[in-house]
Amino acid sequence: MSGSRLFFGVSTIVSIIFAILLPMAHAQSAAPAPAPTSDGTTIDQGIAYVLMLVALVLTYLIH
């Protein structure tokens, strides 16, 4: 009886240790977020340049 009790105690302790350590061994660090390729100010500036060019062409054609 003592041998099976000892085996049960050792196997319980080993299984608890594995249950704690194995998930930590497989964990991966989070990858950093990629840098934004374009933000809103770049798009707004592009639209502003196009509108200024249209206004310049219209002013040239009207006069």
Swiss-Prot record:
The gene is AGP41. Glycans are attached at P32, P34, P36. It is a lipid-anchor; GPI-anchor. This is Arabinogalactan protein 41. InterPro entries: AGP16/20/22/41 (IPR009424). Keywords: Cell membrane, Glycoprotein, GPI-anchor, Hydroxylation, Lipoprotein, Membrane, Proteoglycan, Pyrrolidone carboxylic acid, Signal. Residues 1-27 form the signal peptide. The modification 4-hydroxyproline is found at P32, P34, P36. The keyword Signal applies. A lipid is attached at S38 (GPI-anchor amidated serine). Residues 39-63 form a propeptide. It comes from Arabidopsis thaliana (Mouse-ear cress). The modification Pyrrolidone carboxylic acid is found at Q28. One of its GO terms (cellular component) is plasma membrane.
